[in-house]
């Protein structure tokens, strides 16, 4: 288990930052028929999110236009999604991804699982606020209308953002482990509710104790037990929560590997994780990826993506010396 070590992103504040100069250069890059995509990559992937917000403000003042809007007009395909995605503040980016996961034909349940299983209380609160401001909709109401069953109940619990923080009680851990064991045996609606209540509301520290107690009681790993007892999106969501509790960077490494190798490069997932984790733990995710899968994330992106889209992803991902 790697829950205690230091995590780190790949994008940091640029030294000697000048938002007016950056805005001018972006304005020049976006002029004309064939825009300078390399310039966009070199500037926007080498500035932290707060600096990008300042660039967008300077751009608006300078040209009277919205930088995201201009990029959406000038760029295309997945490259456009990366460049535009970099220009959202993190809570709004999560809100944007959730909105698009639920609107239109079908629901992208995997996006809902990935975001809501992995975000902190503070991130969830800010995401709900951003969702309401941007779309004039209530995130909880949209989740309720677009999902169903115990999957919906668990998402609704997570989106409250009321997980306990930093609290452990070994005696309660033993009791909760017994409840989880019974829930995996009985599988009634009531047991499913108790299962998701524990996984959604107990602190990460407490849940690590619970999972150890569960192993002692049942002789089985928590993830294996869930996979054996449940199915569908409810099962996938429960597993995602357990994996995030144990080692969040390893969870994202797993998501990236699956997106790259199991689904013929699932672009939305790769873009979302690289952008969302770039200033949080992407460097640590890279380490987990290489430890677990033998190849670097940089190597796999380079092999599966192409063109300026590939350049942008690799600039966000960055790499170790041997990757270049």
Swiss-Prot record:
GO cellular component: cytoplasm; nucleus; plasma membrane; vesicle membrane
Name by which UniProt lists this protein: Annexin A10
Annexin repeats, residue ranges: 17-88, 89-160, 171-243, 247-318
Record family assignment: Belongs to the annexin family.
InterPro entries (UniProt xref): Annexin, Annexin_repeat, Annexin_repeat_CS, Annexin_sf, ANX10
Species the sequence originates in: Homo sapiens
Gene Ontology molecular function: any one: phosphatidylserine binding
One Pfam family recorded for the sequence: Annexin
Record keywords: Annexin, Repeat
């Amino acid at each position: 288990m790697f829950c205690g070590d230091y995590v780190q992103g790949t994008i940091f504040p640029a030294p000697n930052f000048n938002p007016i100069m950056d805005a001018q250069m972006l304005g020049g890059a976006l002029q004309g028929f064939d825009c300078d995509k390399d310039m966009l990559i070199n500037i926007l992937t080498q500035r932290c999110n707060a600096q990008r917000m300042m660039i967008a403000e300077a751009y608006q003042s300078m040209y009277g236009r919205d930088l995201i809007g201009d990029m959406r007009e000038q760029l295309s395909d997945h490259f456009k999604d990366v460049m535009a995605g970099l220009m959202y503040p993190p809570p709004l980016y999560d809100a944007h991804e959730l909105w698009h996961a639920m609107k239109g034909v079908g629901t992208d349940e995997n996006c809902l699982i990935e975001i809501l299983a992995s975000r902190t209380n503070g991130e969830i609160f800010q995401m709900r606020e951003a969702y309401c401001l941007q779309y004039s909709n209530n995130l909880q109401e949209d989740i309720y209308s677009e999902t169903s069953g115990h999957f919906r109940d668990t998402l609704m619990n997570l989106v409250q953002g009321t997980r306990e923080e930093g609290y452990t009680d070994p005696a309660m851990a033993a009791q909760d482990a017994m409840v989880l064991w019974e829930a995996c045996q009985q599988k009634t609606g009531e047991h499913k509710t108790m299962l998701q209540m524990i996984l959604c509301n107990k602190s990460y520290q407490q849940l690590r104790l619970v999972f150890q107690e569960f192993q002692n009681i049942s002789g089985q790993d928590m993830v294996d037990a869930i996979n054996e007892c449940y199915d569908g999106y409810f099962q996938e969501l429960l597993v995602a929560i357990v994996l995030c509790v144990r080692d969040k960077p390893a969870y994202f490494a797993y998501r990236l590997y699956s997106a790259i190798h199991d689904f013929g490069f699932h672009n939305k997932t790769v873009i979302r994780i690289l952008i969302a984790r770039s200033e949080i733990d992407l460097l640590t995710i890279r380490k987990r990826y290489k430890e677990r899968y033998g190849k670097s994330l940089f190597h796999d992106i380079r092999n599966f993506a192409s063109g300026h889209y590939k350049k942008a992803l690799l600039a966000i991902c960055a790499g170790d010396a041997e990757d270049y």
